[in-house]
Structure formats: structure tokens, C-alpha cells
Amino acid sequence: MDKKTARLSRSKRTRIKLKELGHTRLCVYRTPRHVYAQVISGDGSTVLAAASTVEKDVKAKCKYTGNVNSAAIVGEVIANRCKEKGISQVAFDRSGYKYHGRVKALAEAAREHGLQF
């Protein structure tokens, strides 16, 4: 089993558990160039809020979109958008990635700006 397949199987396990519990989840996806975050409803049918480094307002705040600083900015933006929609508590779905680097920066920034995991 290669790295990508192992990550995908870890993410499937997490998503199944979160779907059973019915919690709203903050889902993270990363590429070498960008970081994406979505808040998805408990049943998995609706995206309630989203933010990424592809967006112009986020891209303007950072020099390079694939690093820890830009991930922290995405975490801040997603937390603010959740506040506007009245969402304060989410389950953190790291999509099988290690809790390190960009994923950790996004999570900590979201926590600092009012999201509870």
C-alpha cells in the first residue's frame, strides 16, 4: 500500500465515524500549492462554509499560498465565516493527513478565532 492509498483509507475511517455521530465537520484538503477547508453538515449533504488559498482575498494576504502562514490565514477566514453562519462547534476532519505543518496551523488558527473542536 502506497502513501496515498494509506491516507485515503485513514480518511474513510474518520469520515464514517463522524457521519455516524452526525457532527458538523471541518474538512481539510491540501496540495503542494494550495490549502482548502470546508465545513460540511452532519449528514454530509451540504457545504456550510468554505475557504481556500485560491480565493483572491486570501491570496492577497499571503506571498506564497502553499505554506504554513497561508494555512493559518485560511483557518482564520473559515472560522470567521462559521461565526457569521452561527456555527461554533465542529469535528476536525484532517483527511488522513498528519496533524503537523499546514494542517496544524489551519486548526490552531481556527481555534484561536472561535471554532471549538
Curated annotation (Swiss-Prot):
GO terms for molecular function: 5S rRNA binding; structural constituent of ribosome. Disulfide bonds: none annotated. Keywords: Ribonucleoprotein, Ribosomal protein, RNA-binding, rRNA-binding. It comes from the Bacteria. InterPro entries: Ribosomal_uL18_bac-type, Ribosomal_uL18_bac/euk. GO terms for biological process: translation. Pfam families: Ribosomal_L18p. GO terms for cellular component: cytosolic large ribosomal subunit. Part of the 50S ribosomal subunit; part of the 5S rRNA/L5/L18/L25 subcomplex. Contacts the 5S and 23S rRNAs. HAMAP family: Ribosomal_uL18_B. Belongs to the universal ribosomal protein uL18 family. This is one of the proteins that bind and probably mediate the attachment of the 5S RNA into the large ribosomal subunit, where it forms part of the central protuberance. This is Large ribosomal subunit protein uL18. The gene is rplR.
